[in-house]
Structures are given as C-alpha cells and as structure tokens.
Amino acid sequence: YCQKWLWTCDSERKCCEDMVCRLWCKKRL
C-alpha cells in the first residue's frame, strides 16, 4: 500500500506500482 507522502516516481525509490499511485505520479509529471 502506497502512503500519500511516499508517492514518488524516482528511479531509486518507486512507489508507483498501484494504479492510484501511477495516476498521481503522472499528474505530477
């Protein structure tokens, strides 16, 4: 489960495996 404050698309620490996380990351990018 991805925490909101852990959502990131960094190559080193990725937390975008969940669909919601992906959408959030895409929105940020």
Swiss-Prot record:
Disulphides: C2-C16, C9-C21, C15-C25
Q: Does the keyword Secreted apply?
A: yes
Stated name of the protein: Beta-theraphotoxin-Gr1b
SUPFAM superfamilies membership:
omega toxin-like
- Annotated coiled-coil segments of the chain: none
Q: Where in the cell is it found?
A: Secreted
**Leucine amide found at:** L29
Q: What else is known?
A: Negative results: does not inhibit sodium channels Nav1.5/SCN5A, and potassium channels Kv1.1/KCNA1, Kv1.4/KCNA4, Kv11.2/KCNH6, Kv11.3/KCNH7 (IC(50)>200 uM).
Q: What would be an example GO MF term here?
A: sodium channel regulator activity
